[in-house]
């Protein structure tokens, strides 16, 4: 797990300065977590199919020890609240959180453009800055560019499906109330 996680961080160090998929990365924390997962593997512990998988989390989801900007310059951690059930479940399943991905301000926008925190670059065109789609723009770019095995996004009006389409990957909008939304910025109850 630690070797795989380190490989992702090496790729992030090379590509993220150009692609801007991530707004926050905590390599030390991620590698420590991966090391702990490796120790569980060695002890015969199996947390299931997500154990040791390096993932990215959209920057409207609270993750303990990581800032949450909601894509805005307005201080909004108190709106999002503490780490929620979804992130806690992913950690309990052994996922390694690489960092937080860019989003449009307060997750409201389909293009992926963010004049405050920066806009991720669609990885499929090196010459022309094509929009990544939004609002889960960084999550779409991170997966398309191989900067995470998968990424968590949110979707009210296409915010997972649009970046998935624009970046040539699969995005899934689950049924309402399928996943808990505590610890996630409340754009809409969907």
For each feature predicted by the language model, list its residue ranges.
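Structural motif
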Residues: 52, 167-169
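Short loop segments at secondary-structure junctions
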Residues: 146, 175-176
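A short core secondary-structure module
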Residues: 176-190
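Structural signature of FAD isoalloxazine-binding scaffolds in flavoprotein oxidoreductases
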Residues: 161-166
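Gly/Ser-rich catalytic/binding loops embedded in alpha/beta enzyme cores
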Residues: 1-156
């Amino acid at each position: 797990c630690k070797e795989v996680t380190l490989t992702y961080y090496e790729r992030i160090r090379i590509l993220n300065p150009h692609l801007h998929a991530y707004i926050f990365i905590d390599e030390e924390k991620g590698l420590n977590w991966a090391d702990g997962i490796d120790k569980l593997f060695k002890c015969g512990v199996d947390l299931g199919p997500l154990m040791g998988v390096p993932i990215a989390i959209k920057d409207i989801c609270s993750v303990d020890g990581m800032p949450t900007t909601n894509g805005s310059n307005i201080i909004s951690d108190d709106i999002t609240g503490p780490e929620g059930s979804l992130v806690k479940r992913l950690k309990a399943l052994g996922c390694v959180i690489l960092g937080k991905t860019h989003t449009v301000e307060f997750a409201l926008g389909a293009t992926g453009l963010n004049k405050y925190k920066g806009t991720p670059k669609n990885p499929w065109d090196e010459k022309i800055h094509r929009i990544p789609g939004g609002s889960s723009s960084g999550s779409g770019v991170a997966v398309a560019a191989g900067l995470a095995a998968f990424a968590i996004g949110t979707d009210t009006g296409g915010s997972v499906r649009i970046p998935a389409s624009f970046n040539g990957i699969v995005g899934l909008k689950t049924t309402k109330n399928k996943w808990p939304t505590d610890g996630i910025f409340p754009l809409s109850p969907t």
